């Protein structure tokens, strides 16, 4: 393939479908220094749609590792007011926000888990208003990825750097439906299909889901009254439709924070802030994790669960068929953006207010009353695989087959 041409199309897809950049709109991009060449294409695509300005905030995993090594927990947990103000100013101006991920999935392995937690919690507290705006769809936002040597070599260690880098680009573009002549048109069709699935679930007015599989998962997930099933397209208050994740294969909603019970096992490793957690399980009672275990990344999982009261409860339930483009690659990307779109998943932490009627206009207290979970974190992990069965229940006890053998029933 002509990679340069393909990457230009991918950048245009991100700007047009992902962010849906409007004339005169500012754009803020967060990206790794390793993705500089692709970021330039995205910046140009945004300007071509009429962006007022496109600002880029760079991050570097090696520098992050040094900061975690040498700074104190107190220093790591402190975020300057100037940084908070920068994001608030962008929000006030109606900006669109883009995050381009691509770091080595295990690049922060070995760092002090207490320092990592201090850094994560400090940033989450400081950026709470921004994250509330994002999760309420008050502005357009999108998370995408770009190939880097560090990530590619983790997936294809047998290849040299260049071959691995190119192979990962090939997989990313394929998973993102960006290899054809008109990716934008292809995405319009894809969104329609997901909207139909969401409509089916919404019309059944389910009150509970029962999830089982051969890994040992046996989980009941209660759903709040007036919950909404969302799909690929979102609608910002100040803009037209945007797509928050490219790729996306999911239909998702808000669980009731107090109504999850049973046990769940992960189906794929979880990459949490540059550290892999794997072969783990969580036991729930009355919505809360009461016991857990992990063969890899136990301390990081423990710190995640101890972030706050809401980090032991779930804020998202997402349905993804096992027979999906990303799952069918049989590649473990070690990156949640991709792996969550290869399997059904749940998220520990904060719920999306958009998943309940009137949610974006509710106060935190009102959201809690209807069953929405609140937390500083929102961390997806994969629970679905080829043997996953999901049955829905209506208020009058009727059973609705949702998934059988990993796919839509």
Segment roles from a protein language model:
Residues 259-261, 277-279, 286-289, 312-316, ...:
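Active-site lining segments that contact anionic ligands and/or coordinate catalytic metals
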Residues 365-409:
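Extended hydrophobic packing segments that form well-structured cores
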Residues 251-309:
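Long, well-ordered mid-to-C-terminal structural blocks that present hydrophobic/aromatic surfaces
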Residues 222, 292-293, 403:
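Short linear motifs in exposed loops
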Residues 1-261, 392, 398-400, 408:
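Active-site bordering "gate/hinge" segments
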Residues 109-112, 153-157, 232-234, 275-278, ...:
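A short secondary-structure junction signal
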């Amino acid at each position: 393939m002509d990679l340069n041409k393909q990457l230009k199309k991918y950048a245009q897809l991100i700007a047009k479908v992902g962010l849906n950049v409007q004339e005169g709109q500012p754009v803020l991009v967060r990206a790794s220094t390793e993705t500089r060449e692709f970021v330039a294409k995205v910046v140009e695509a945004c300007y071509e749609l009429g962006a007022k300005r496109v600002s880029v905030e760079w991050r570097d995993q090696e520098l992050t590792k040094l900061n975690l090594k040498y700074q104190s927990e107190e220093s790591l947990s402190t975020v300057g007011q100037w940084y908070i103000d920068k994001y608030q100013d962008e929000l006030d101006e109606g900006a669109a926000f883009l995050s381009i991920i691509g770091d080595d999935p295990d690049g922060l392995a070995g760092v002090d888990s207490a320092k990592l937690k201090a850094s994560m919690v400090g940033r989450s507290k400081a950026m709470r208003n921004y994250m509330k705006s994002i999760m309420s769809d008050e502005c357009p936002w999108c998370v995408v990825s770009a190939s880097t040597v560090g990530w590619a070599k983790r997936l294809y260690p047998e290849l040299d750097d260049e071959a691995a880098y190119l192979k990962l680009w090939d997989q990313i573009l394929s998973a993102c439906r960006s290899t054809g002549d008109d990716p934008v048109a292809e995405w319009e069709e894809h969104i329609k299909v997901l909207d139909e699935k969401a409509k089916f679930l919404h019309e059944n007015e389910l009150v509970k889901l029962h999830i089982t599989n051969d890994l040992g998962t046996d989980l009941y997930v209660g759903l709040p009254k007036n919950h909404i099933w969302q799909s690929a397209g979102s609608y910002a208050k100040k803009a037209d439709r945007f797509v928050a994740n490219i790729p996306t294969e999911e239909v998702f909603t808000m669980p009731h924070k107090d109504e999850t019970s049973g046990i769940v096992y992960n189906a794929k490793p979880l990459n949490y802030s540059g550290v892999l957690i794997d072969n783990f399980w969580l036991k729930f009672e009355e919505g809360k994790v009461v016991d857990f275990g992990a063969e890899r990344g136990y301390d990081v999982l423990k710190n995640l669960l101890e972030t706050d009261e809401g980090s032991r409860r779930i804020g998202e339930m997402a349905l993804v068929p096992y027979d999906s483009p990303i799952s069918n690659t049989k590649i473990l990307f070690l990156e949640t953006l991709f792996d969550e779109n290869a399997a059904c998943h749940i998220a520990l932490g904060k719920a999306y207010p958009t998943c309940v009627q009137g949610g974006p206009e509710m106060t935190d207290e009102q959201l809690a009353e209807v069953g929405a979970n609140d937390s500083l974190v929102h961390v997806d992990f994969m629970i679905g695989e080829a043997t996953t069965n999901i049955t829905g229940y209506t208020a009058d006890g009727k059973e609705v087959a949702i998934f059988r053998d990993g796919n839509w029933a």
